[in-house]
Amino acid sequence: MVAHVICGQNELEKGIALFNQRLEGSVKSSAKPEPITNAISHFQYALKNSATETDAELYLLKSYYFRGKYVHKNKEKQKADFNRGKELGENYIKKYPDSAPFRYWYLVNLG
């Protein structure tokens, strides 16, 4: 059923659907990597569409934080995701200087 729904959606919608599934199958504070990693891939594709770019950028910040915090147990992989979120956040707060959500998720990725 989920695969059928995802087929008719644009990249942002696919990413959001997977982002919303990020906790499925989680145990305590450990989540499975597939939903969030696949969501990130769809958000990256959604960046290419000006109609979905801004939402995709914000979801990427949220997604890198989630994957670093709840998927990776290896400190280097966690750090890589948090650093990616930080780098993207720095770019996005320059692009959207008055956006509280971008500033918030940038700060969250700083730890």
Cite the ranges covered by each PLM segment.
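Canonical positions in the second alpha-helix
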Residues: 46, 91-92
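N-terminal leader/linker segments that initiate helical-solenoid repeat arrays
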Residues: 4-64
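Short coil turns that delineate tetratricopeptide repeat
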Residues: 51, 97-98
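Extracellular-facing segments of soluble proteins and assemblies that are Gly/Ser/Thr-biased and enriched
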Residues: 101-110
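TPR/TPR-like alpha-solenoid repeats
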Residues: 63, 70, 109-110
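Surface-exposed, active-site-proximal loop segments in enzymatic domains
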Residues: 24-27, 68-77
